[in-house]
């Protein structure tokens, strides 16, 4: 038996560092506040009232991470935008059902807390929340010695939104003849990064190598685009039948999630050009066209189905919101034995 008096810090957990982190992020968190949020940071639970404008409010929840994009961010020591990625992955899933994000919580876990790194990450989370109009109401910072390699950390996000019951977008309104509009992505977003890292490995490429005047690292770590405000505006002013968020599974798996069983999406491949980074990945990794569309968004972050009569208005609204938007295809009747997504 040792006579040495042990403390939690001796075991690798620095409560002082955790408190310092909270102080560092308070201002960033405060900027995300909504009038419905009651109280501040530090409570055992976060309180949030429902916005009074909703007659029959339905809560919509989601949780996500950023996959192995985090590995790339850690290796390249770029921590300031991965938080935006985390928020985007959650709120973009909520908006496809027409939900306005209300509040967000994060989970940050590491072996030894580096306050500078954690503060940078959480500032990015707060910025993503500001862009989404949702409040960062709390989170968990877990310092767990022996659980992670030195310098590593993990992230998860949790978001709750609200939608009027009569205005839920679930794809049931999709009809043959509907038009499909694409919203451009900012890059690979937060999907396909295990394949991206494999391509970097087998090609021997250096992340500092330039592509179209920018280092590959900038292309790969470009933060995921947040579509909340532009899509909320679109929903208010047009009749939207379905929205698909192109994440893991790409075109082949995400678009069918919002289509009735008797319909298919016919995508016109000539309607857009892949951003250069996707051509680079396909060439350097010798990746098939099918695999590209299954793994990556290939420049398309969202696909929106709406009646043909709404197209002109929708494109104008989206352009005003700063989105790159175009007609990418249409909805047709699904024949026997056909796939629900055709890319022609």
UniProtKB/Swiss-Prot annotation:
Source organism, top-level taxon: Bacteria
Keywords in alphabetical order: ATP-binding, Cytoplasm, Ligase, Nucleotide-binding, Purine biosynthesis
UniProt xrefs under InterPro entries: PurM-like_C_dom, PurM-like_C_sf, PurM-like_N, PurM-like_N_sf, PurM_cligase
Pathway(s) per entry: Purine metabolism; IMP biosynthesis via de novo pathway; 5-amino-1-(5-phospho-D-ribosyl)imidazole from N(2)-formyl-N(1)-(5-phospho-D-ribosyl)glycinamide: step 2/2
Cellular component aspect of the GO annotation: cytosol
Reactions accelerated catalytically: 2-formamido-N(1)-(5-O-phospho-beta-D-ribosyl)acetamidine + ATP = 5-amino-1-(5-phospho-beta-D-ribosyl)imidazole + ADP + phosphate + H(+)
Pfam families, per database record: AIRS, AIRS_C
EC class of the enzyme, as a word: ligase
Nucleotide-binding in keyword set: yes
EC number: 6.3.3.1
The UniProt record lists the keyword Membrane: no
A GO molecular-function descriptor: phosphoribosylformylglycinamidine cyclo-ligase activity
Subcellular location as annotated: Cytoplasm
Gene Ontology biological process terms from the UniProt entry: 'de novo' IMP biosynthetic process; adenine biosynthetic process
CDD domains in the record: PurM
Sequence similarity: Belongs to the AIR synthase family.
Name of the molecule in the record: Phosphoribosylformylglycinamidine cyclo-ligase
Organism: Haemophilus influenzae (strain PittEE)
């Amino acid at each position: 038996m040792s006579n040495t008096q042990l403390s939690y810090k001796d075991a690798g957990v620095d409560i002082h560092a955790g408190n310092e982190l909270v102080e560092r992020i308070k201002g960033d968190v405060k900027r995300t506040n909504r009038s419905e949020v009651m109280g501040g940071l530090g409570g055992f639970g976060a309180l949030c009232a429902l916005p009074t404008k909703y007659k029959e409010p339905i809560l919509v929840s989601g949780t996500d991470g950023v996959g192995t994009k985090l590995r790339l961010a850690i290796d390249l020591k770029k921590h300031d935008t991965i938080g935006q990625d985390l928020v985007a992955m959650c709120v973009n899933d909520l908006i496809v059902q027409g939900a306005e994000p209300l509040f967000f919580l994060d989970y940050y876990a590491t072996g030894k807390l580096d306050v500078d790194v954690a503060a940078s990450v959480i500032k990015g989370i707060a910025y993503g929340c500001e862009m989404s109009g949702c409040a960062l109401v709390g989170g968990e910072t877990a310092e767990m010695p022996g659980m992670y390699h030195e310098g590593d950390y993990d992230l998860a996000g949790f978001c709750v939104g609200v939608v009027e019951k009569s205005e839920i977008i679930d794809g049931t309104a999709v009809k043959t003849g509907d038009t499909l509009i694409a919203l451009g992505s900012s890059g690979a977003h937060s999907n396909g990064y295990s394949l991206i890292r494999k391509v970097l490995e087998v090609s021997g490429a250096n992340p500092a190598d330039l592509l179209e005047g920018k280092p590959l690292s900038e292309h790969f770590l470009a933060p995921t685009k947040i579509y909340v405000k532009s899509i909320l505006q679109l929903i208010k002013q047009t009749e939207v039948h379905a929205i698909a968020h192109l994440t893991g599974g790409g075109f082949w798996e995400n678009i069918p999630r919002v289509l009735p069983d008797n319909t298919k999406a016919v995508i016109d491949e000539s309607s857009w050009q892949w951003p250069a980074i996707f051509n680079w990945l396909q060439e350097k990794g010798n990746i098939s066209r099918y695999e590209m569309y299954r793994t990556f968004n290939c420049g398309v972050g969202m696909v929106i189905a709406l009646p043909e009569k709404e197209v002109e208005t929708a494109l104008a609204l989206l352009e005003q919101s700063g989105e790159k938007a175009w007609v990418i295809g249409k909805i047709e009747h699904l024949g026997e034995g056909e796939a629900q997504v055709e890319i022609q």
